C-alpha cells in the first residue's frame, strides 16, 4: 500500500484533557508540536488527506487538549499537542495543557520523535528556542518543519534553514522539511520521513 494511502486511514481516538484519559497503545507514536497558529491542524489534514480530521482556526490557542489519531488501524498514532505561546484561555487552563504536554513527552514509551513546526513567515521566536532546548535537555528526538513556505521568498526560507544549521543541535533529525499545507508542498517528503522513522 502506498504511503499516502496508509496515512489517509486516520481515525480520531480521543481528545485527552487529563493524564488518565491518555490511550494505552503499544504501537509507534509521533507527536506534532509548535507555537499557536503555526499550522498544526492544517498539516495534519494535509498528511492524512482529509480536511476534516483536525479542526483549523485563525484564532490562536484553540487546541487545549492532546488529540490522538490512529493511523491505518495499527500503523502508528499521530499525537496533536496543544500550541504553545499564545492563548486567551485562563492561566489554570494553560497550565493544565502545558502539564499534559510535558507529562506526555517525558513518559510516552512509544514516542519516536516530535515533529516541530516553525512558521517560516514569523521565524524562530524565543519560545521556540526554549522548547527546542527543553527537548535537547530531555534527549527527545525531533524533526523541524518550516510551514507556510508559500507566503515567503526563497531568500527568507534559506535564512531560516541556515539558522537551524548554525544552532549546533544534538537531537534534531534531518532533513529540515519545508512545507505548505495549502499547496501540498513537502507533504510527501514528510510522510516518507514518518514512515522511515517507524521502519527503523
Swiss-Prot record:
PANTHER family: ENGB-TYPE G DOMAIN-CONTAINING PROTEIN, MSS1/TRME-RELATED GTP-BINDING PROTEIN
Any single biological process term in GO: division septum assembly
CDD domains given in the database record: YihA_EngB
Residues reported to bind Mg(2+): 41, 63
GO molecular function: GTP binding; metal ion binding
SUPFAM superfamilies, per database record: P-loop containing nucleoside triphosphate hydrolases
EngB-type G domain span: 26-200
Origin: domain of life: Bacteria
Keywords: Cell cycle, Cell division, GTP-binding, Magnesium, Metal-binding, Nucleotide-binding, Septation
Descriptive protein name: Probable GTP-binding protein EngB
HAMAP family to which the protein is assigned, alphabetical: GTPase_EngB
Amino acid at each position: 500500500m502506498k504511503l499516502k494511502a496508509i496515512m489517509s486511514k486516520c481515525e480520531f481516538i480521543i481528545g485527552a484533557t487529563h493524564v488518565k484519559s491518555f490511550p494505552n497503545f503499544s504501537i509507534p507514536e509521533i507527536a506534532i508540536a509548535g507555537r499557536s497558529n503555526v499550522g498544526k491542524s492544517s498539516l495534519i489534514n494535509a498528511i492524512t488527506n482529509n480536511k476534516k480530521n483536525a479542526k483549523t482556526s485563525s484564532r490562536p490557542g484553540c487546541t487545549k487538549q492532546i488529540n490522538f489519531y490512529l493511523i491505518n488501524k495499527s500503523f502508528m498514532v499521530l499525537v496533536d499537542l496543544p500550541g504553545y505561546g499564545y492563548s486567551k484561555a485562563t492561566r489554570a487552563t494553560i497550565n493544565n495543557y502545558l502539564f499534559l504536554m510535558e507529562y506526555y513527552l517525558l513518559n510516552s514509551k512509544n514516542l519516536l520523535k516530535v515533529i516541530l513546526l516553525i512558521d517560516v513567515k514569523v521565524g524562530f521566536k524565543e519560545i521556540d528556542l526554549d522548547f527546542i532546548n527543553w527537548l535537547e535537555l530531555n534527549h527527545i528526538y525531533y524533526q523541524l518543519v518550516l510551514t507556510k513556505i508559500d507566503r515567503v521568498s526563497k531568500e527568507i526560507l534559506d535564512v531560516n534553514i541556515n539558522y537551524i544549521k548554525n544552532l549546533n543541535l544534538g537531537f534534531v533529525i534531518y532533513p529540515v522539511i519545508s512545507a505548505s499545507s495549502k499547496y501540498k508542498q513537502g507533504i510527501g517528503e514528510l510522510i516518507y520521513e514518518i514512515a522511515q522513522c517507524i521502519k527503523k
